[in-house]
């Protein structure tokens, strides 16, 4: 009975680890594709730091959402 419980817990832990690894891979692909909030608003060449409350302007500069692109 104890062995069965240990095996079930081990399988659950391994399954959780696989899901975490898969989620991290999908997140990296999503970030590289330019679909994050900041990069979606302009050029994809602003870099990974331009996201959240920022936007990427056509001249590849990262600005606040409240600033206009000049």
UniProtKB/Swiss-Prot annotation:
InterPro entries: Conotoxin. Expressed by the venom duct. Disulfide bonds join 46-57, 50-62, 56-69. GO terms for cellular component: extracellular region. The modification 4-carboxyglutamate is found at residues 60, 67. The keyword Disulfide bond applies. GO terms for molecular function: ion channel inhibitor activity; toxin activity. Residues 23-43 form a propeptide. The modification 4-hydroxyproline is found at residues 48, 58. Residues 1-22 form the signal peptide. Keywords: Disulfide bond, Gamma-carboxyglutamic acid, Hydroxylation, Ion channel impairing toxin, Knottin, Neurotoxin, Secreted, Signal, Toxin. The keyword Signal applies. It is found in: Secreted. Pfam families: Conotoxin. The presence of a 'disulfide through disulfide knot' structurally defines this protein as a knottin. Probable neurotoxin with unknown target. Possibly targets ion channels. Belongs to the conotoxin O1 superfamily. This is Conotoxin Cal6.11. It comes from Californiconus californicus.
């Amino acid at each position: 009975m104890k062995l069965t419980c240990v095996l079930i817990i081990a399988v659950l832990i391994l399954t959780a680890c696989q899901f975490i690894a898969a989620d991290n891979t999908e997140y990296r692909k999503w970030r590289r594709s330019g679909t994050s909030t900041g990069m979606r608003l302009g050029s994809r060449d602003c870099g990974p730091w331009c996201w959240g409350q920022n936007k990427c302007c056509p001249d590849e500069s990262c600005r606040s959402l409240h600033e206009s692109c000049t």
